[in-house]
């Protein structure tokens, strides 16, 4: 079995590779332009990557934090992707585990995400509850999923 390690992007080269991977996996298949893989919360978010022995990125995930209901902190996982040839090896599960651990460390009450229809079973197996169908900016079926952390 190949060897992987997990980290946060640190160098300019890693950040560039991170955003390129994100676009290739999550935006290009929908015909979206380079640049659509970023949003206004990048600097505030906690980013994780999975790398091969030669430091190629094969998995990514991000979590950012929101204040809701006056002081209650909520977390949203976004931009989860694992290269097709590495799916089923536990990489996505480990990325989500690390993101949720960061949320717990910050005392977050709940964590949510918008999952593509084909990913709902994956997130349910990790403890997320399916809430409702939602409209996504990609015009592709997505579902609101939530996990209570307290």
Give the predicted meaning of each segment.
Residues 82, 88-101:
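Conserved acetyl-CoA-binding loop-helix of GNAT-fold acetyltransferases
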Residues 20-53, 57:
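Active-site rim helix/loop that mediates acceptor-substrate recognition in acyltransferases
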Residues 96, 103-116:
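Conserved GNAT acetyl-CoA-binding A-motif
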Residues 42-44, 71, 137-141:
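Short acidic/glycine-enriched loop/turn segments that link adjacent beta-strands
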Residues 112-114, 124, 129-144:
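Conserved catalytic-core motifs of GNAT/GCN5-like acyltransferases
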Residues 78, 85-87, 122-125:
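Acidic/histidine-enriched, beta-strand-rich ligand/metal-binding domains
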Residues 1-13:
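Conserved N-terminal entry element of GNAT/NAT acetyltransferase domains
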Residues 49, 56-66, 74-81:
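Conserved beta-strand in the GNAT
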């Amino acid at each position: 079995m190949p060897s992987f390690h997990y980290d946060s992007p640190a160098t300019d080269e890693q950040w560039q590779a991170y955003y390129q991977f994100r676009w290739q996996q999550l935006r290009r298949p929908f015909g979206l332009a380079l640049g659509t893989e970023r949003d206004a919360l990048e600097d505030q978010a906690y980013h994780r990557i999975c790398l091969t022995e030669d430091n190629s990125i094969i998995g990514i995930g991000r979590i950012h934090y929101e204040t809701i209901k006056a002081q209650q902190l909520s977390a949203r996982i976004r931009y989860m992707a694992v290269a097709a040839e590495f799916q089923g090896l536990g990489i996505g599960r480990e990325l989500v585990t690390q993101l949720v651990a960061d949320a717990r460390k910050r005392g977050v009450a709940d964590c949510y995400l918008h999952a593509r229809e084909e990913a709902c079973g994956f997130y349910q197996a990790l403890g997320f509850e399916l809430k409702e169908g939602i409209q996504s900016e990609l015009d592709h079926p997505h579902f609101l999923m939530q996990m209570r952390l307290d």
